[in-house]
UniProtKB/Swiss-Prot annotation:
Family under the similarity heading: Belongs to the peptidase S14 family.
A cellular-component GO term for this protein: endopeptidase Clp complex
Record note on quaternary structure: Component of the chloroplastic Clp protease core complex.
Enzyme class: hydrolase
Keywords: Chloroplast, Hydrolase, Plastid, Protease, Serine protease
Active-site residues annotated for this sequence: 101, 126
Physiological role: Cleaves peptides in various proteins in a process that requires ATP hydrolysis. Has a chymotrypsin-like activity. Plays a major role in the degradation of misfolded proteins.
HAMAP family, per the entry: ClpP
Lineage, uppermost ranks: Eukaryota, Viridiplantae, Streptophyta, Embryophyta, Tracheophyta
GO BP, sorted A to Z: protein quality control for misfolded or incompletely synthesized proteins
Protein name, per record: ATP-dependent Clp protease proteolytic subunit
Catalysed reaction equations from the record: Hydrolysis of proteins to small peptides in the presence of ATP and magnesium. alpha-casein is the usual test substrate. In the absence of ATP, only oligopeptides shorter than five residues are hydrolyzed (such as succinyl-Leu-Tyr-|-NHMec, and Leu-Tyr-Leu-|-Tyr-Trp, in which cleavage of the -Tyr-|-Leu- and -Tyr-|-Trp bonds also occurs)
Location in the cell: Plastid, Chloroplast stroma
Superkingdom of source: Eukaryota
Protein's organism: Arabis hirsuta
Amino acid sequence: MPIGVPKVPFRSPGEGDTSWVDIYNRLYRERLFFLGQEVDTEISNQLISLMIYLSIEKDTKDLYLFINSPGGWVISGMAIYDTMQFVRPDVQTIGMGLAASIASFILVGGAITKRIAFPHARVMIHQPASSFYEAQTGEFILEAEELLKIRETITRVYVQRTGKPIWVVSEDMERDVFMSATEAQAHGIVDLVAVQ
């Protein structure tokens, strides 16, 4: 039996009456938001609009992005990453469960010194993939060139944000590399592992 989205009480500052709002609405008001699904344009646009709105509302208070995602669309994930770099408040990233593929890219995009992984979190990095095997030859070549450009961009970001040499990052991206929270910390993807 599904429970739906829980409702929690909320009282706006200066108001006497308490209203019931869904839990995500309440957490957004506290500047906490979640990437708990595959990354696509819909969730990307929702997170981007939240970050922009909350940074306009108050540009000195940190934002907190909790990540438990298998990854998803590369361009949508890169849009989230770019927004995190653009907004004035620091975006703290918290990896919990799984941060794989483009979700690990978003995780590494948090403010330096403010990237955290829960103790049992898993992180996975790899090279971007495509389904160009279904395309005709001309499209195949164009898509392969675009994929190579995206891979170079992602590699540069990992190098910049982890402090690892380009050859280490490039080698790791050749295949699926799964890491524990402490391994992700040693790799420079997160700065801290939350204490159990």
